[in-house]
Amino acid sequence: MKKKTNIIIFLLAIILTLPAFAQDTLSHEKVLPTGIFVSYGQGWYAVKDQYISKEQYSGMMPYYNLEWLRFRNKKGYRLQFEYRKSTDISNHNITTDAQQVSFSQDFIFAAGDFPVGSKNVYAFLGPSVQIFYYELYYNFAQPGNYITPTTLGFLGSLGINANLIYPLNKKLNLEGFLRSNVLSITGKKIDDERYRDDQTPAFVSVISASKIDFHLSVRYFLAKNVALSVAYKFDLSRINKWDPYIAASNSALITVQVKL
């Protein structure tokens, strides 16, 4: 009887220690993709700037991205350059040439992990600095004339960024990313007579001006230092202090990552 009891206790001890052996042995430094990233995408873009027109203009717009990410000892940073331009943004028979440029620096810190199913989700959080600039050229045709009024604006922002990474296995990651401004200095083309006492640029909160970037991606590691990802990206930019401006896009992206 005593021998049988000892066997039962031994088996229970093995069962109770199995979760410890099955625990995720990954770390934040191992799961966060680093190196150089080059992206290309296409998506639907819509814009309205009431300095020129209250109508919405929309169409397909390409997306180009170049970034570099470094992460060691639970902290790091990302440098990112994004560019978009299209001459096919329109409203009925009126076309608009649209251009967007942004430069971002994200500071990244490990922010813990939590279990989802049999794996852990790894969280990253930190402050961000971003500069965003846009231009719109409207092509208004009139008898005997071809008028091209322009409008432009910018946002220089302090904000936050957050990453969630869910490693499904050694080859495949699910990843989510969000960046949002909190406090900004912003300016745009305005009617000087109408806004004589409220000139540009101005310091504003996220209530009056927004710049939000969000994407979900699946990353597949082709080799130890090379990965390929496909992603959905949502982008929103808004300046509401003067004649309102708002632009949004939904894009599909493909990215090549090379770890240095």
Cite the ranges covered by each PLM segment.
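Cleavable N-terminal export/targeting peptides
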Residues: 1-33, 260
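Short glycine/proline- and aromatic-enriched beta-strand/turn motifs that initiate or cap beta-hairpins
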Residues: 22-78, 86-88, 257-259
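Residues that define the transmembrane beta-barrel architecture of outer-membrane proteins
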Residues: 34, 56-64, 75, 95-103, ...
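Transmembrane beta-barrel strands of outer-membrane/channel proteins
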Residues: 36-44, 79-87, 125-133, 176-182, ...
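Residues on the lipid-exposed face of transmembrane beta-strands in outer-membrane beta-barrel proteins
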Residues: 40, 62-72, 103-113, 127-131, ...
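Extracellular loop and loop/strand-boundary signature of outer-membrane beta-barrel proteins
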Residues: 47-56, 86-97, 143-150, 200-204, ...
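Repeated loop/turn-to-beta-strand initiation elements of outer-membrane beta-barrel proteins
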Residues: 72-78, 115, 168-174, 224-230
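Outer-membrane beta-barrel transmembrane domain signature
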Residues: 136-225, 236, 260
